[in-house]
Amino acid sequence: MPTSSQDNRILVLGIGNILWADEGFGVRAVEEFHRRYAVPDNVTILDGGTQGLYLVNYLEEADRLIVFDAIDYGLEPGRLKLVRDDEVPRFTGAKKMSLHQTGFQEVISAADLLGRCPKHLVLIGCQPLDLEDWGGPLTPPVRDQIAPSIDLACQVLAEWGVTVSRRSAPLAESERLLANDIDHANYEMRPA
């Protein structure tokens, strides 16, 4: 298992709805990150799905946070953008960046109001192409950004002194973030 400082609690979080095409980018990215890499004990990998304010407790426990999400930056579809710390909107009056009904900035704001927001925030967002395809897969330009987004997360973790290691064997089904029937390979890549 990789090593890192145990007093530096890190949360790697993917948020989104896998049932709405590109809205599922964050969940699919964190799922693939978990499939590819082993992390030290002070790093938690979480599929936050569409849990909204239920995620506040997880943020309160973290010193540092990396979030994968589909973000409407107004860029060309499939474009990645990384924002850090104060660039990540914390207050509900900020322009909504998240595509979820409860914006993630409300979650950050709630943790901040409780005085327990992570000290360092990194948001890795991908500009969606299609949010209207109920039950549809990620579109190609968004799907193609999963690997580069994971590379960005690994770079951030390295900046924070965290060593991750590539898994040598596939995860057992019981260790996956998502049940086998809704993971990326079995759900989105199934024959039409």
From Swiss-Prot:
This is Hydrogenase expression/formation protein HupD. Not known. Could be involved in the processing of hydrogenase. GO terms for molecular function: aspartic-type endopeptidase activity; endopeptidase activity; enzyme activator activity; metal ion binding. Keywords: Aspartyl protease, Hydrolase, Metal-binding, Nickel, Protease. Belongs to the peptidase A31 family. The keyword Protease applies. It comes from the Bacteria. Ni(2+) binds at E23, D69, H100. GO terms for biological process: protein processing. The keyword Cell membrane does not apply.
